[in-house]
């Protein structure tokens, strides 16, 4: 079992990756990790899940947004996103910008390898993330 943690801005929206590649990435995640995928974004903080509205406003297909809303679980965190990570289970965290203090928490837990850093300017980034997830399996 592996947890997947998803940021939105710079990862799924506001990125150079074509929408079709982002859809492929999300479809793969929903298919392979339906019970262990979590939002780790400012749009879902303190358990308040505003992700579906934000994704719809930013052009993700409505049927996919509905599936994401039903499947991807909200997280509870206040200051650092790492507060929501379960370090007892292997994970992949897709994010574009980690805070220095979040990196320090990852180092404390020897979990730096759990982060897949996304570059929103790279139009191949969603494909690279998909290839990475496929390479590590579940």
Each predicted region: which residue ranges?
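Alpha-helical substrate-recognition element adjacent to the catalytic core
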Residues: 1-76
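C-terminal cap/substrate-recognition subdomain and adjoining C-terminal extension
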Residues: 49, 53-138
């Amino acid at each position: 079992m592996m947890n997947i943690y998803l940021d939105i801005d710079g990862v799924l929206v506001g990125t150079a990756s074509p929408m079709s590649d982002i859809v492929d990435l999300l479809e793969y995640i929903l298919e392979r990790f339906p019970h262990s995928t979590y939002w780790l974004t400012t749009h879902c903080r303190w358990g308040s899940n505003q992700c579906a509205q934000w994704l719809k406003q930013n052009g993700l297909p409505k049927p996919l947004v509905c599936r994401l809303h039903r499947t991807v679980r909200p997280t509870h965190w206040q200051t650092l996103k790492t507060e929501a990570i379960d370090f007892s289970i292997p994970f992949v965290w897709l994010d574009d910008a980690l805070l220095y203090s979040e990196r320090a928490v990852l180092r404390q837990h020897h979990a730096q390898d759990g982060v897949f850093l996304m570059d929103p300017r790279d139009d191949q980034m969603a494909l690279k993330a998909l290839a990475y997830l496929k390479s590590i399996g579940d």
